[in-house]
């Protein structure tokens, strides 16, 4: 199941259903400012738009070129194109220089990566691009979500239904909260805080090197 082609197929309809930033992201950014902000797995740019209000320059990275087109259109239509750039790239191999980001948002994307090594490598990449004083927010779907009746992490597919009725399967790794914390602990990130909210695991993180690691 190819992640890029999956989201290229559903990009237009997906974007139509993703208008507003998540409240957890709004809370994370509320009292923070920086020169550069990063949105990993930016989709249609809804969180990049919010980052652009808290950083002088926001960068959105996504594997789907069709979603990047949606994000570019959103930025132009909503007036934040001058302070946002959208780049094609993989969360596990970010096309960005080391130590350049003050703020980062990596939400609703980690759970699409497979296998586990790719998920951890993406966390390492987030650590790599954060500046020494940088801070990020990571989220993933969790077993705490109402739709799941499991306590241990597992792989699954969740169908996306297009307007004509066609279904497109999407890969997910559903994290148990303890497993989410374990993967973060194995990465080059340091966890500042964690919580489970609206069926998602969240972590506020910094780069390990900032703490002498």
Placement of each model-derived feature along the sequence:
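Class I (Rossmann-like) S-adenosyl-L-methionine-dependent methyltransferase catalytic domain
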Residues: 1-33, 44-92, 135-213
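Conserved S-adenosyl-L-methionine
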Residues: 41
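Short conserved loop adjoining the S-adenosyl-L-methionine
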Residues: 93-98
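A conserved beta-strand element that flanks and buttresses the S-adenosyl-L-methionine
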Residues: 105
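Short catalytic micro-motifs in class I SAM-dependent methyltransferases
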Residues: 108-112, 140
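A short glycine-rich, Lys/Arg-flanked "PGG" loop and its adjoining helix->strand segment in the class I
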Residues: 120-132
């Amino acid at each position: 199941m190819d992640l890029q082609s999956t989201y290229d197929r559903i990009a237009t309809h997906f974007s139509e259903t993703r208008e507003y930033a998540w409240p957890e992201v709004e809370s994370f950014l509320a009292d923070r400012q920086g020169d550069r902000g990063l949105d990993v797995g930016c989709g249609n740019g809804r969180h990049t738009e919010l980052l652009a209000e808290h950083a002088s320059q926001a960068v959105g990275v996504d594997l789907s070129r069709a979603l990047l087109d949606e994000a570019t259109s959103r930025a132009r239509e909503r007036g934040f194109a001058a302070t946002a750039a959208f780049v094609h790239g993989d969360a596990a191999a970010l096309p960005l220089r080391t130590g350049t980001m003050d703020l980062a948002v990596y939400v609703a994307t980690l759970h699409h990566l497979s296998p586990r090594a790719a998920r951890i490598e993406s966390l390492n990449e987030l650590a790599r691009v954060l500046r020494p004083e940088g801070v990020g927010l990571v989220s993933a779907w969790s077993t705490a979500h109402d739709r799941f009746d499991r306590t241990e992490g597992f792989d699954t597919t969740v169908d996306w239904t297009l307007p004509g009725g066609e279904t497109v399967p999407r890969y997910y790794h559903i994290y148990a909260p303890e497993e989410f914390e374990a993967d973060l602990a194995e990465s080059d990130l340091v966890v500042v805080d964690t919580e489970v909210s609206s069926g998602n695991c969240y972590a506020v993180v910094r780069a390990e090197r900032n703490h002498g690691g």
